[in-house]
């Protein structure tokens, strides 16, 4: 597959590996999730370039060849959104359209809250906007879902899951990258999906071709999974540091859910009044599972912005 060649972009507080395509002028920044890579948008980049957009697709801090600071706090929401602001500055853009999937969506939502003037419009996949909780979210999940809920585990036992995932990167990613995992309402992923298994009986079907899987495996064998998991270890810090932030998204917004995603859909209309909401018949990895339909929705929505 013809994927753009990366270059290293040196920012104020980090260096990001950035994949770029298209002519300058109409910037659109594509933000990956966990555990992903800029390559997750391989199906969208050529279509967006053909439509006249300048695609800027970073491996965010902790991923690929981008900076991997040692301190957990260096992955908080202010650092992650600050990287995107600095990226716009590096390309000499005042604002851009931002697309986010999974954790990328969380970063884009917060970018719009913390730096609203830099966000022209938002297209997010899988993870909807959620207003700031009234209490520490990790403590809430621990009380409601127990110690084995992955976010709780990542926070309470740092390094344990990463060691297991890094011991067999391809096996771990094979467990994660599956399509329509929750097509059957009774389907569940293993509680501790980071632990080795023969993968027999897992819900859904393998999503990636061998050459596609090889890109992700190579990237995570290089970067490891400790830094990406540090994003999760900042939920409490993010909550503590955003108490005074107004919870409202004023930008035009496209929200795409996967019908069989484990991430629940929510009513965002109070906080995101301009949300245009769609549901595709797929699981969590929306733009990879349903690239044609995702691209159609993106292009129609982008066309309406012009």
What is each residue range found by the language model?
Residues 2-5, 15-16, 27, 63-99, ...:
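Flexible "cap/lid" subdomain of the alpha/beta-hydrolase fold that forms the substrate-access gate
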Residues 6-8, 55-57, 255, 276-279:
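Conserved beta-strand scaffold positions in the cores of enzyme catalytic domains, especially
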Residues 12-20:
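A short loop-to-beta-strand scaffold at the N-terminal edge of the catalytic core in hydrolase folds
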Residues 19-67, 87:
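Conserved HGGG/HGGXW glycine-rich cap/lid loop of the alpha/beta-hydrolase fold
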Residues 33, 76, 289-290:
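Active-site helix-initiating loop/hinge in glycosyltransferases
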Residues 44, 111, 297-301:
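Hydrophobic residues on the short alpha-helix immediately C-terminal to a glycine-rich phosphate/catalytic loop
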